[in-house]
Amino acid sequence: MKTLAKFILITAALLLSTPSIAQSDVSDVSEELKIAAVEALIAAPADKALPLVTKVLEGNHSNEVKERALFILSQIDQPEAQSTLLKVARENQNDLGLEAVRMIGISGNDESLASLASIYENGNSEAREAVLEAYMIAGDKQSVFNIALTAEGDDFDEAIEMLSVMGARDELRELRGKTGVSEALIQAYAISGDFESLRELALDGSDVELQTQAIEAMGIVGGEQVDSTLVEIYRSATAEDVREAALHGMLISGHDAGVLELYRSSQDPSEKKQLLEFLVMTGSDEVWNIIDSTLTGDQ
């Protein structure tokens, strides 16, 4: 094992110090070898790999080679590795700096993750997005929640979208009490699969626009509870917008059986026409029998 580690270190040192060659084919081979050399450092002892990785980052190498070096740093459990990642993240307003931010997320180091807050506050939109990605990778819901509390506009939307991807239902519910209901929050409830929050909003008629958005978003969650609730909402609704939203929700969830049930129980020709149109959109096999029966006068 010591022989293998020694071979890796010698190979890496030689390849990473190789000068660039003019010929494109030879240059490509050299680049691939440098990448392989850096990746090989994953098996090297930390005290041996760290100096070589640092040398790569300080040298005249391509971003692709340096990005591999950043990953190796993320796997080295030493303070020096974390400080180097933070240094690259803070000092490079480019793809390399953004990659360093994401690598901090992969490392999962609590102190480094906490330091990303200042990069978020002072960085551009790409830097802020990279910080959110790092928190997602690390599973740090609290940090994303803290950002959402004070963020506005697109930054707020991106933060709650990230929370939804992380399945942070409790945090999203808490945000409702602090920031109010918005279309972005409704979509976040849908992505996180929060049926209860959506159902509560879907049954609240104080704001019809938000209500209809919540009803349609329930279709994204899907499942038996959603399907039965959408049918119930349709039957009890008096507003046309709400009824149509319920149909859209069933269309999204693929609940053609519910639309078929409503069609068969309806006695209103105008309503049956609309329901038939939705049945066609759902792709229900039964719709062709209904059309055939209608054309032959059986319905």
Across the structure, where does each feature detected by a protein language model lie?
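Post-signal peptide N-terminal segment of secreted/secretory-pathway proteins
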Residues: E64-E67, F71-S83, Q93-M103
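N-terminal, post-signal-peptide region of Sec/Tat-exported proteins
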Residues: E31-Q78
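Core register positions within helices of long alpha-helical scaffolds
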Residues: A40-A43, I72, M103, A134, ...
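Bacterial N-terminal signal peptides that target proteins for export
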Residues: M1-I8
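N-terminal signal peptide c-region/cleavage motif recognized by signal peptidases
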Residues: S17-P19
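Positions within the helices of HEAT/ARM-like alpha-solenoid repeats
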Residues: L33-K34, E64-K66, D95-G97, E126-R128, ...
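Amphipathic alpha-helical scaffolding segments comprising HEAT/armadillo-like alpha-solenoid repeats
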Residues: A22-S27, A46-E58, Q78-R90, L98, ...
